[in-house]
């Protein structure tokens, strides 16, 4: 029986472990975590076969290692991996949100017959910890795989086959492309959202109306500022070059719009907003792009026949109108697989009550 070792068993690691444990009986699922309570909880809910107290021993008996730890910790583990007497053709992957630094270990690890296929499952939840793990967390989510060396083709193919039961949508790309694109669509938006929140906080003492008015669209467009600060500190530092370059682009755009406003150049200001609207409106509806200011509700459901109709039937039976409905494929920053839009906050609140048996977020 082959051994899969999870290093880090929070929401992401726990959900992957839960999925593999459910779908495979020919693997022994081991887990190591610096928080021993996570391991005990994982054993109690049956998503792992064995908890590991001795990391070194576990690494040397593993056939596959999945590092589901913050980026900085993963980098440390990878830098020390060649110190151990690992099995031949060991496959190693991770779940981090930045790839350049992690993938820099690929060539050196290959010399020791260790095959690094870096991974980024773009799924998540506002809840953390292994007790919130869900085996269906990755359904319809994009799962990015990154490797450069042709010698790792076989390992990448094996890993995709192993993870097929997650029902994720796999994309293979290069580390630099991954970090640049995620810098645009994820990392910089997190920074901008936090800047907007700081702007609000800096003035709320003298302008108490801010808190009342911010409960609407402002709260929606800055939702991602509530993400885990430790994780985003690591991501920001590990994607430093791309983030700094993109922030410089934003500075140039801010300077440009400042000048247009100062000059009262109404045609160019109009074009500024129209071009943004036109580009955003043509983005694929099912792909998570810009943040909606509608009264959206996210429902965490497995991708099974009849689930969407079950949800909509419950809502309609309570005389609540739905104005839009979409299945999300990229879910790293959106909590839930199904996004439902309502015409009022009251309708959304009533839907939450009607869907009390489901995990709902907004």
Swiss-Prot record:
<feature type="binding site">
    <location>
        <begin position="3"/>
        <end position="33"/>
    </location>
    <ligand>
        <name>NAD(+)</name>
    </ligand>
</feature>
<dbReference type="GO" id="GO:0006571">
    <property type="term" value="P:tyrosine biosynthetic process"/>
</dbReference>
<dbReference type="InterPro" id="IPR045865">
    <property type="entry name" value="ACT-like_dom_sf"/>
</dbReference>
<dbReference type="InterPro" id="IPR002912">
    <property type="entry name" value="ACT_dom"/>
</dbReference>
<dbReference type="Pfam" id="PF20463">
    <property type="entry name" value="PDH_C"/>
</dbReference>
<dbReference type="InterPro" id="IPR050812">
    <property type="entry name" value="Preph/Arog_dehydrog"/>
</dbReference>
<dbReference type="GO" id="GO:0004665">
    <property type="term" value="F:prephenate dehydrogenase (NADP+) activity"/>
</dbReference>
<comment type="similarity">
    <text>Belongs to the prephenate/arogenate dehydrogenase family.</text>
</comment>
<dbReference type="GO" id="GO:0070403">
    <property type="term" value="F:NAD+ binding"/>
</dbReference>
<comment type="pathway">
    <text>Amino-acid biosynthesis; L-tyrosine biosynthesis; (4-hydroxyphenyl)pyruvate from prephenate (NAD(+) route): step 1/1.</text>
</comment>
<dbReference type="InterPro" id="IPR046826">
    <property type="entry name" value="PDH_N"/>
</dbReference>
<protein>
    <recommendedName>
        <fullName>Prephenate dehydrogenase</fullName>
        <ecNumber>1.3.1.12</ecNumber>
    </recommendedName>
</protein>
<feature type="domain" description="Prephenate/arogenate dehydrogenase">
    <location>
        <begin position="2"/>
        <end position="291"/>
    </location>
</feature>
<dbReference type="InterPro" id="IPR046825">
    <property type="entry name" value="PDH_C"/>
</dbReference>
<keyword id="KW-0028">Amino-acid biosynthesis</keyword>
<keyword id="KW-0827">Tyrosine biosynthesis</keyword>
<dbReference type="InterPro" id="IPR008927">
    <property type="entry name" value="6-PGluconate_DH-like_C_sf"/>
</dbReference>
<dbReference type="GO" id="GO:0008977">
    <property type="term" value="F:prephenate dehydrogenase (NAD+) activity"/>
</dbReference>
<dbReference type="Pfam" id="PF02153">
    <property type="entry name" value="PDH_N"/>
</dbReference>
<keyword id="KW-0560">Oxidoreductase</keyword>
<dbReference type="InterPro" id="IPR003099">
    <property type="entry name" value="Prephen_DH"/>
</dbReference>
<keyword id="KW-0520">NAD</keyword>
<feature type="domain" description="ACT">
    <location>
        <begin position="296"/>
        <end position="362"/>
    </location>
</feature>
<dbReference type="Pfam" id="PF01842">
    <property type="entry name" value="ACT"/>
</dbReference>
<keyword id="KW-0057">Aromatic amino acid biosynthesis</keyword>
<dbReference type="InterPro" id="IPR036291">
    <property type="entry name" value="NAD(P)-bd_dom_sf"/>
</dbReference>
């Amino acid at each position: 029986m082959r051994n899969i070792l999870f290093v880090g068993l929070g929401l992401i690691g726990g959900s992957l472990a839960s999925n593999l444990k459910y779908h495979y009986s020919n693997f022994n699922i081991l887990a190591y975590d610096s928080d021993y309570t996570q391991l005990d909880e994982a054993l109690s809910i049956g998503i792992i076969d064995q908890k590991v107290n001795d990391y070194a021993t576990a690494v040397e008996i593993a056939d596959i290692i999945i590092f589901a730890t913050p980026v900085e910790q993963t980098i440390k583990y990878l830098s020390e991996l060649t110190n151990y007497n690992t099995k031949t053709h060991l496959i190693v992957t991770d779940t981090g949100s930045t790839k350049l630094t992690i993938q820099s270990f690929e060539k050196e690890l290959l010399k020791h017959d260790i095959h690094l296929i870096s991974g980024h499952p773009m799924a998540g939840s506002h809840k953390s910890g292994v007790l919130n793990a869900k085996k269906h967390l990755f359904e319809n989510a994009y799962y990015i795989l990154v490797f450069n060396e042709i010698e790792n083709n076989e390992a990448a193919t094996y890993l995709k086959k192993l993870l097929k039961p997650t029902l994720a949508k796999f994309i293979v790309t290069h580390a630099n492309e991954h970090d640049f694109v995620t810098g645009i669509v994820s990392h910089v938006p997190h920074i901008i959202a936090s800047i907007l929140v700081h702007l609000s906080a800096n003035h709320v003492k003298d302008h108490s109306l801010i808190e009342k008015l911010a409960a609407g669209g402002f709260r929606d467009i800055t939702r991602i500022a509530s993400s885990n600060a430790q994780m985003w500190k690591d991501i920001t530092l590990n994607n430093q070059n791309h983030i700094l370059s993109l922030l410089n682009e934003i500075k140039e755009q801010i300077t440009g719009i400042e000048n247009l406003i100062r000059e009262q150049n109404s045609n160019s200001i109009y074009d500024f907003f129209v071009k943004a609207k036109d580009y955003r409106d043509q983005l694929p509806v099912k792909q998570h792009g810009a943040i909606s200011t509608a009264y959206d509700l996210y429902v965490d459901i497995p991708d099974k026949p009849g689930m969407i109709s079950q949800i909509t039937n419950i809502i309609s039976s309570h005389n609540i109108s739905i104005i839009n409905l979409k299945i999300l494929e990229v879910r790293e920053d959106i909590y839930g697989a199904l996004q439902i839009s309502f015409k009022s906050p009251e309708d959304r609140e009533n839907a939450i009550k009607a869907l009390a048996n489901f995990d709902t977020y907004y």
